[in-house]
Amino acid sequence: PVDTPNIKLTTEPDAELNDSETTESLTHAETGSADTSATAVSTFQAGGLSLEPAKGDWASESLQQQVEVANNATDLQGQHDGLVSVINHCYKMRKQADYCQYGAALQLTYLELYRSLHQQHVAQKNTDDIKAPAFMQLSTLLNDVGQFDEALKVCQQALEYQLTDGTVTGFEGRIKRIEKAKAKA
């Protein structure tokens, strides 16, 4: 079994927030996600990320360090960069099922964190500064673990943010490829 983070975001009702911090409450039931395989807790709130450590023989020291860096980040940009690093590492190691599962399970945490970061950048009128390779990587990880609908949602979300994945066909082409893979499954 893989120790994967549950994508459950919690709210601290007494926390004071400034413009660069946010708290949200999001659960699998609220998002309609059918994936219930992720059981460990991961939170994103004003105090920072709380990703479940990657445990087991499969988890490299590098991944464990990246999870720790992400958890220790105190601002949205640092949390985003740390989480992107974890997702990128899982993406690179996706031929190993444990990495693929762990990375795919970060989907909702990443989408919520990106939404908050995007809102912050919109308020500061500098959305061009956000780099978001994790949308492409998450869609691939989700596709690889057979969560085709979730992979499609990630691509559609990227299109809503007007992001590109660096390929000729973009997220539109990626959506078509995921739909083909879904039809074959």
What are these regions (language model features)?
Residues 121-136, 166-185:
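TPR/TPR-like alpha-solenoid helical repeat scaffolds
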Residues 1-80, 98:
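Long, contiguous interaction/recruitment modules in multidomain scaffold/adaptor proteins
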Residues 69-72, 82, 94-97, 171-178, ...:
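Polar alpha-helical coiled-coil and adjacent low-complexity
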Residues 141-150, 154-167, 175, 179:
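Amphipathic alpha-helical binding modules
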Residues 60-62, 75, 95-99, 124, ...:
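Short, structured coil/loop segments at alpha-helix boundaries
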